[in-house]
Amino acid sequence: MTRIGTPLSPTATRVLLCGCGELGKEVVIELQRLGVEVIAVDRYANAPAMQVAHRSHVINMLDGAALRAVIEAEKPHFIVPEIEAIATATLVELEAEGFTVIPTARATSLTMNREGIRRLAAEELDLPTSPYHFADTFEDYSKAVQDLGFPCVVKPVMSSSGKGQSLLRSTDDVQKAWDYAQEGGRAGKGRVIIEGFIDFDYEITLLTVRHIGGTTFCAPVGHRQEKGDYQESWQPQAMSPIALAESERVAKAVTEALGGRGLFGVELFIKGDQVWFSEVSPRPHDTGLVTLISQDLSQFALHARAILGLPIPLIRQFGPSASAVILVEGQSTQTAFANLGAALSEPDTALRLFGKPEVNGQRRMGVALARDESIEAARAKATRASKAVVVEL
């Protein structure tokens, strides 16, 4: 039975969030609504989730000793990783010592590294995936490309948001894709995965929540990527009943193997009735931002309920809905957003501005949300709202 105490008192239920981006911010807001005391930790000050938490700490998230020191001082009831770039070995140790990691330390560890999760899905669970090789050297990588043929995809085994990812179409791309992968890895230069290209019709994120009452799926989320980064998403993605059932089977197998409680974003490729597993995040997913307008319980509310052991009897979906990101390019520590009245002038629209403290290059700084009579209309409306926002650097 779940019992939640009073924040900032001896009875408080404490959650420590590792990583404080826009997804973490929404998780914190949902936890705050349930009277949870939230401590936010990231590598830079004034990160979005820190702005809505009770207090925060700035540390190098890959420094196991620093992470342990904060967790031992705060004594949280739940440790909730929101990003991949964390000292996962320390989380494994802390879990063994009695701390609760969401969903589990093993899930966080396996999914930080594309190799761990790919081998689990393809080799242990025997799920359909693209053909793949791993390589540590340019020589092995070149052999793998030759073996898989063109087109193929290369990614660092440890990276996020599409960093270091390339689609190779010919021998001209081999060297530059290798160089880009070496720059884009979270832990610096190193191992890459080379995947055969699947000629899919579309890709989806199946938001899958493991909670006290079992496993529940949100309606499938379709999305469009550019250079591995999400640009827009929509829900529900139209699918055949066979493809949807197979997607749910694959998502359930992967999330069951990872264990624990919480929301998972399972990425899948779909061609007709065929489904291939791509990746999984053991936390809310950027493409799932659409659920802020498309569902009565957003992915963030679902994650909060699952963490706290609260039931999820039903997820109500409101019909065709879409999200379109607000990308900012340039350099600023005082970005402002104008023309918001025009952006919100149509019915069934909403904005989320993330409050990120700076932009240096290109950064996702907000998202526009919309509902309409069809997916096409909802996507167009969300895009209009996003484009209407005027960014002042």
Swiss-Prot record:
Transmembrane segments: none
Binding site for Mg(2+): E267, E279
Binding site for N(1)-(5-phospho-beta-D-ribosyl)glycinamide: E22, L23, E82, D286, K356, R363, R364
GO MF terms, alphabetically ordered: ATP binding; magnesium ion binding; phosphoribosylglycinamide formyltransferase 2 activity; phosphoribosylglycinamide formyltransferase activity
Gene3D superfamilies named among the record's database cross-references: 3.40.50.20, ATP-grasp fold, A domain (3.30.1490.20), ATP-grasp fold, B domain (3.30.470.20)
SUPFAM superfamilies: Glutathione synthetase ATP-binding domain-like, PreATP-grasp domain
Domain ATP-grasp: 119-308
Pfam families: ATP-grasp, PurT_C, RS_preATP-grasp-like
Keywords: ATP-binding, Ligase, Magnesium, Metal-binding, Nucleotide-binding, Purine biosynthesis
EC number(s) per entry: 6.3.1.21
GO cellular component: cytosol
Record bears the keyword GTP-binding: no
Binding site for ATP: R114, K155, S160, S161, G162, K163, G164, Q165, E195, G196, F197, I198, E203
Catalytic activity, reaction form: N(1)-(5-phospho-beta-D-ribosyl)glycinamide + formate + ATP = N(2)-formyl-N(1)-(5-phospho-beta-D-ribosyl)glycinamide + ADP + phosphate + H(+)
GO BP term, example: 'de novo' IMP biosynthetic process
Function recorded in the entry: Involved in the de novo purine biosynthesis. Catalyzes the transfer of formate to 5-phospho-ribosyl-glycinamide (GAR), producing 5-phospho-ribosyl-N-formylglycinamide (FGAR). Formate is provided by PurU via hydrolysis of 10-formyl-tetrahydrofolate.
Subunit structure comment from the entry: Homodimer.
Similarity comment text for this entry: Belongs to the PurK/PurT family.
The protein's name: Formate-dependent phosphoribosylglycinamide formyltransferase
Species of provenance: Pseudomonas fluorescens (strain SBW25)
Gene it is expressed from: purT
